[in-house]
UniProtKB/Swiss-Prot annotation:
Pfam family, one: Semialdhyde_dh
Main location: mitochondrion
Family as reported in the entry's similarity comment: In the N-terminal section; belongs to the acetylglutamate kinase family.
Enzyme Commission (EC) number: 1.2.1.38, 2.7.2.8
Residue ranges occupied by any N-acetyltransferase domain in the UniProt entry: 341-492
Protein name from the UniProt record: Protein ARG5,6, mitochondrial
InterPro entries: AceGlu_kinase-like_sf (IPR036393), AcgluKinase_fam (IPR004662), AGPR_AS (IPR023013), AGPR_type-1 (IPR000706), Asp/Glu/Uridylate_kinase (IPR001048), NAD(P)-bd_dom_sf (IPR036291), NAGK-fArgBP (IPR041734), NAGK/NAGSA (IPR011241)
PANTHER family: N-ACETYLGLUTAMATE SYNTHASE, N-ACETYLGLUTAMATE SYNTHASE, MITOCHONDRIAL
Superkingdom assignment: Eukaryota
Active site: C669
Keywords from the UniProt entry: Amino-acid biosynthesis, Arginine biosynthesis, ATP-binding, Kinase, Mitochondrion, Multifunctional enzyme, NADP, Nucleotide-binding, Oxidoreductase, Transferase, Transit peptide
Annotated region (Disordered), positions in chain: 509-532
């Protein structure tokens, strides 16, 4: 039940990402004229690189323990520009006491291609030098008073500590760049009060970006200058905050020797601070003073200017990798958070739509097996207490039933709720109110380990796991008996039997808590059952799509072209096919009939213009050969209502149905990308999606027309078929949802981009939730990439697949804009045809599709 990570597979993948190859060693021996000294130098460098990278992989695998954490690492590795990964503020004591550990952690990040912006302080060193000279450090509100003598010491300390850290990094093969000036411009904070202390007015990003772009880790001090060049001292926490405001990194980390904020009353480390709920009371605590108070104030002000999902972690240097790459984190996490709200009746929910949207996370409700209305009716008839944050990213409902043990009836969380640990806050609040609790979870729940950690005991039956805490042996035994004798089987989908959603007069049975991640309901059939060679006949394959399909078949391990037919090219050698010497023929109806009768063709591919292939299909039908299959690339049979044709979009249509079909209609290029981009949101759509599609001129075919006239297209964009385009009908028909589609042709050769406006139920989804929906729906799909950024059409040209990204929600929260790109000749035609052929012949679905040409987000 607990997921295991294939660390060998991750290791292989990571070595590829780090470009581990023998090139370093090959280069050593390539130049025979190199001196022995130079050869030894290169060998040493290569060995350092190999061992440091191997060590990096081992460190990563030791710190990552679950699939979700692997995904989190890959997300950070690919989703942001390098300078936006993290801002790390290093306390001065770390450099003095834990320099080697700090250098090792930063080297780890460097070797996996992540470039944090490092800014260090030097407080303890300054105090030590000042005390040696008999100068007593002075502070006001946690700010060091900096007179000229103190500034002399401050500057000296900063330069020394900066050099120490840079030198330590260089010794272990990390390129580091000292940046001790030129980043922060400041004015006097209060010259009379603090003297040479600055208030930062602007941040110059150029030195930082230049360092990262050159492959160096930037190592900054918090010294600032006025416009006239006067050095000013700035608190390192404040400077780190200004950097974070400017770069908006994924992670903001403060490293200190205590590994977090220590509660001065209890001596314990504070694990989390939710500022919206705790800030004012926290500042009143007697132990919150000096640097601690300044740090909390600065972080509070910083987070007001960043997305609510942002947070600051204050940790020990040894926990840096754990904080960056795991869900568990370490140290003290400070975030804005939300105030937690308790409710005891439906009337207490000020926004009913927010409640309904939260309940839609329950799979029974989401799939329509149970309605929101029926569950609300149940809640109205029982005594319950709900727990949630303000936006209901997490909603927990505890049902109280007479003398029975209270039951956690719902625990519904968005992915945001899990990643921000709101779930822990909610559960802790429940434990304060209920000394005893029970709940049931499906054994396939992705968060099962979390539930085990919250319970005192568990009992499993028929795919469901009963959890509890706070029960003695007799109470636990009684609860297990009740659970064991209940009518719940391996599933709770039959609500009538379980009594889960029946009327108020009936007893409500156990109901599983729902937080598991949705997975792909139609996974790829990557592993084939057959390896016997099959023969393909191409009818009319003289255009761009035909050329690409021929190239794919030429590289396919089990497919051979036996016939290729074209009236215009009859008698010419088939170009681009190297397995055999094939010559174009001009097959007539009688030839088709003869070949079909003699079992000479396993797959017929109709690559003909719309409205042309019917006589060929009818002839194949007349023979009634059960062994052959037909794949039609035209639009002729995409609207079939007879049941004879199957629509071949494997990512959205049942793959087993496609595999068993005699006749497969290959989807259109525009239609494929649009359906992939819209389908996962169908249940949230509140109006007509509008699709602005632009294709390269190869989509207009090889026959000359204004739509493939390169002179007319130069510096131009030509709209056509403004309404009722055949792909508009195709998209609407397949989605069961009317869409508006306007195609355009542009001056590039191949590739399509869609910008799609989708009306959604107001406030139902955030951008992140939408992206998560797409990632879950297309999990495991090799030909679909989900990207946080809007994809570019130039990146998809020549690549196999669809890229979907953008996911921008408007300020009114009732419209999302999604961008999708596809190569119209490949996944929009030839590659998709090959997928359908593979499925029909029981090959692996991706056989013959070159993996090096798959696009990745």
């Amino acid at each position: 039940m607990i997921r295991q990570v294939n660390k060998k597979a991750i290791s292989n993948s990571l070595f590829k990402r780090l470009s581990l190859s023998g090139s370093a060693f090959a280069n050593i021996t390539a130049n025979k004229k190199s001196s022995t000294h130079q050869l030894n130098q290169k060998t040493q460098l290569a060995n350092v690189r190999f061992y440091s990278t191997k060590s990096t992989v081992i460190q990563l695998l030791n710190n990552i323990g679950s699939k979700r954490e692997v995904e989190q690492y890959l997300k950070y590795f690919t989703s942001v520009s390098q300078q936006q990964f993290a801002v790390i503020k290093v306390g001065g004591a770390i450099i003095t006491q834990q320099l080697n550990e700090l250098a090792s952690c930063l080297a780890f990040l460097y070797h996996v291609g992540l470039y944090p912006i490092v800014l260090h302080g030097t407080g303890p060193q300054i105090n030590e030098l000042l005390e040696n000279e008999g100068v007593e450090p002075e502070y006001i509100d946690g700010i060091r008073i900096t007179n000229p003598k103190t500034m002399e010491v401050v500057r000296k300390c900063f330069l020394e500590q900066n050099l120490r850290l840079v030198t330590a990094l260089e010794k272990i093969g990390v390129h580091a760049r000292p940046i001790t000036a030129g980043v922060f411009e400041a004015e006097y904070l209060d010259k009379d009060k603090y003297q040479l202390v600055g208030k930062i007015t602007s941040v110059n990003k150029s030195p930082v970006e230049a360092a990262i772009n050159s492959g160096y880790l930037p190592i900054l001090t918090s010294l600032a200058e006025t416009s006239s060049g006067q050095l000013l001292n700035v608190n390192a926490d404040v400077a780190a905050g200004e950097l974070a405001r400017e770069f908006e990194p994924l992670k903001i980390v403060y490293l200190n020797e205590k590994g977090g904020i220590i509660n001065g009353n209890t001596g314990e480390k504070v694990s989390a601070i939710n500022l919206d709920e705790e800030y004012e009371d926290l500042l009143k605590e007697s132990w919150v003073k000096y640097g601690t108070k300044l740090k909390i104030k600065e972080i509070h002000d910083l987070l007001q200017h960043l997305p609510r999902s942002s947070s600051v972690a204050i940790i020990d240097v040894n926990d840096l990798q754990k904080e960056l790459f795991t869900d568990s984190g370490a140290g003290t996490l400070i975030r804005r958070g939300y105030r937690l709200i308790n409710r005891n009746s439906l009337r207490d929910f000020g926004n009913p739509d927010l409640l309904r949207n939260a309940l839609l996370r329950d799979p029974e409700i989401k799939t329509g097996k149970v309605s929101v209305a029926s569950y609300l009716k149940f809640l109205d008839s029982v005594q319950f207490k709900s727990y949630g944050d303000e936006p209901l990213e997490v909603l927990a409902i505890v049902v109280e039933q007479n003398d029975k043990i209270p039951k956690l009836d719902e625990f519904l969380s968005s992915k945001t709720g899990w990643l921000n640990n709101v779930t822990d806050n909610i559960f802790n609040a429940i434990k304060k109110d209920y000394s005893q609790l029970c709940w049931v979870v499906n054994e396939n729940d992705a968060n099962l380990p979390w539930y085990f950690s919250k319970s005192d005991g568990s009992f499993a039956k028929n795919g469901q796991i009963l959890f509890w805490y706070g029960l003695n042996i007799d109470e636990a035994s009684k609860l297990i008996k009740e659970f064991d004798s209940s009518s719940i089987g391996s599933s709770l989908s039959s609500s009538k039997e379980s009594g889960v959603f029946t009327s108020a007069q009936q007893k409500r049975g156990f109901h599983h808590s729902t937080v598991r991640r949705n997975t792909n309901p139609n996974p790829p059939l990557s592993e084939g059952k057959q390896t016997e060679r099959k023969k393909v006949a191409l009818i009319g394959a003289r255009g761009y799509t035909g050329q690409n399909l021929i190239k794919l078949i030429d590289n396919h391990p089990y497919l051979d072209i036996s016939y290729v037919s074209s009236r215009e090219l009859e008698g010419q050698k088939l170009q681009g096919y190297n397995k055999d010497n094939i010559v174009y023929s001009n097959l007539q109806i009688e030839d088709i009939k003869r070949l079909e009768e003699n079992n000479e063709v396993d797959v017929w591919v109709m690559a003909l213009p719309n409205g042309v292939c019917k006589p060929f299909v009818d002839t194949i039908d007349l023979v009634q050969n059960p062994n052959s299959k037909i794949v039609d690339l035209s639009a002729d049979y995409r609207f079939d209502t007879t049941g004879e044709w199957t629509y071949g979009l494997p990512e959205l249509n049942d793959r087993k149905t496609i595999a068993q079909a005699k006749k497969i209609s290959n989807p259109g290029c525009y239609a494929t990308a649009a359906q992939v981009a819209i389908a996962p949101l169908k249940e949230y759509i509140s109006g007509t999606p509008s699709i602005f599609g632009v294709s390269g001129y190869s989509g207009a075919g090889t026959k000359p027309s204004p739509k493939n006239d390169v002179n007319l297209l130069s510096n131009n964009l030509i709209p056509y078929s403004l309404t009722d385009h055949v792909h508009e009908k195709e998209i609407s028909s397949q989605l069961g949802l009317q869409v508006a589609f306007t195609p355009h042709v542009a001056q590039w050769f191949q590739g399509i981009t869609h910008t799609i406006n989708i009306p959604i139920k107001k406030g139902s989804l955030t951008s992140r939730e939408i992206r998560n929906i797409y990632q879950d729906r297309y999990q495991g799909e090799k030909l679909i990439t989900i990207s946080g950024e809007a994809p570019l059409v130039k990146d998809i040209s020549g690549k196999h697949g669809v890229v979907v990204g953008g996911f921008a929600v408007n300020s009114n929260e009732d419209r999302v804009v999604i961008v999708a790109t596809i190569d119209n000749l490949l996944k929009g035609a030839a590659t998709q045809c090959l997928q359908n052929i593979n499925l029909s012949q029981e090959f692996g679905e991706y056989d013959g599709i070159p993996t090096e040409s798959l696009i990745r987000g």
